[in-house]
Amino acid sequence: MTPCLLIAGPTAAGKTALSLAAAERVGGEIINADSMQVYAGLPLITAQPDAAERARAPHHLFGSIDPAIRYSVGQWTSDVLALISDIRGRGNVPILVGGTGLYFNALTRGLAPVPEIGDAARARAAALLDADGLAGLRAEALRLDPVATNRVDAADRQRLLRIVEVGFETGTALSVFQADTVPPLEPAAWRGIVIEPDREALYRRIDQRFEHMLEAGALDEVAAFMQRDLDPDLPASKALGVPPLIAHLRGEMSLDEARDNAKRDSRRYAKRQGTWFRNQAASWSRIGTLDSEAAISALADILDQPPG
């Protein structure tokens, strides 16, 4: 059985082009592993593959979830395992592509069986963050679960919130749940590739890509999204670029300010992604260029090597 191919990397690193090259080379079908690209209604601002790209290979879980839904990593994992089975049943190779490290961890290391977080625990953690800031949130996370907290970046707001929410909801440390997990994919069933480009070159591409998004109509897309009046705490409402463009549309900042904030947020996110993949996917193969042709050539070399 040909292993699944996992292609990861920071935002704007060229993962879509690489996944298409891989699909055409091995007879693959592409599965989304980006937590924002799952949502409908935001194809431009979340950089989902366009119609021409989708025509080159079958694509799954892109723009398929209503943004009013909180789509959890557990739901994603369940959906992906079913897709992997279907794709293999057709004799094709599953190719998972994206930048959400938690998704890749869920597949390759297992998903902790944490109970559903209730509204009260979620609100309590959010109130703590509002009152005491990120430093206060991290202090509470360290109190509740020093093991899990010391594994995450001190600036990783989402993961720190998760640690605190689990502690508030269950009275048990997240690391306790994580200690007894079985990975859905055995090591022999997958091989991983990380795109790890020069940081300054990546930052330039991030800035250029956001300009292209605006030219393609991202502001109108966000305006339509805004009309749904969704909870600003929903994951889709926090997609990169969405909050500053909404602030601009509400008259709270100029378009130039929104543009600068969106680029800044994307660069910071890319930095966190790079750190995560260096630490959590250290054994994966590396591609260190943003040049599409060079990256595809490097991919071919990796695929020519025997798995393992």
From Swiss-Prot:
GO biological-process terms attached to the record: tRNA modification
Cofactor requirements of the protein: Mg(2+)
Record note on quaternary structure: Monomer.
EC identifiers of the protein: 2.5.1.75
Broad EC category: transferase
Residues the UniProt record annotates as site (Interaction with substrate tRNA): 100, 122
Chain's role: Catalyzes the transfer of a dimethylallyl group onto the adenine at position 37 in tRNAs that read codons beginning with uridine, leading to the formation of N6-(dimethylallyl)adenosine (i(6)A).
GO molecular function terms attached to this record: ATP binding; tRNA dimethylallyltransferase activity
Catalysed reactions, semicolon-separated: adenosine(37) in tRNA + dimethylallyl diphosphate = N(6)-dimethylallyladenosine(37) in tRNA + diphosphate
Binding-site residues for ATP, renumbered to this chain: 9-16
Gene: miaA
Family listed: Belongs to the IPP transferase family.
The name this protein goes by in its record: tRNA dimethylallyltransferase
Binding site for substrate: 11-16
Matching Gene3D superfamilies: 1.10.20.140, P-loop containing nucleotide triphosphate hydrolases
Disulfide topology: none
NCBIfam families per UniProt: miaA (TIGR00174)
Keywords: ATP-binding, Magnesium, Nucleotide-binding, Transferase, tRNA processing
Organism: Maricaulis maris (strain MCS10)
Interaction with substrate tRNA: region residues: 34-37, 158-162
